[in-house]
Amino acid sequence: MTSLNPVLTIGYQLTEPMREHLGLSRSEARRRAIELLEMVGIPMAKSRIDDYPHHFSGGMRQRVMIAIALSCDPQILIADEPTTALDVTIQAQILEIIKRLREELGMAIVWITHDLGVVAGMADRVAVMYGGYIVEEAPVFELYANPKHPYTQGLLKTLPNLEGQRAERLKSINGQPPNLNQKPLSCSFAPRCSQTMERCLVENPVLENRNNNHKVACWWNP
């Protein structure tokens, strides 16, 4: 939502890509822009199309960004942290909008997020990345039920458990993330891993299929 240019109206920012890439006239692009704003739930879209970004709340600006992303009819939408900095209520609204648009428009969505709750509710297949590499990839239910990489296991253990009689201390993954300026010659997670073996310190594991289309990049295989 901070990607919007503060000195240009949302109408201009919406119509520009359509005129450039779809060859629409000014009036056609404006008409389509109003339709897109209505599609993402902007009230009184026709009268608000000439407003500036600061006239909108954070959640409404995020809806405008979704409208811009959809303006050229993509087959794949890349959603990079689409709910960051939004409160829980607005986050749920944005997720419902994207979910509805996915069904209505028949497009695929690539989610990039650190929110495991969003992943569980929105994804069909999940790729877990660490240090710039995919360390585990599986169908979403399989991944949550049977995580195989120590990093994935650690991530899931950090989620608060609301069941039970008493609250438990949240668990964390010890250590620090790797230096991404240096290409690893061994497993990037090894310094933080509880299952580290000698091979982990000298050789970088490759992503391989274990079972049920469940891929893991780890030398540890219990």
Label for each model-derived stretch:
Residues 28-40, 155-158:
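ABC nucleotide-binding domain "signature" region
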Residues 71-75:
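A short, proline-enriched helix->beta-strand linker immediately N-terminal to the Walker B motif
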Residues 78-82, 86-168:
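P-loop NTP-binding/switch modules centered on Walker-like glycine-rich loops
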Residues 4, 12-28, 38, 42, ...:
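ABC-type ATPase nucleotide-binding domains, specifically the catalytic core motifs of the NBD
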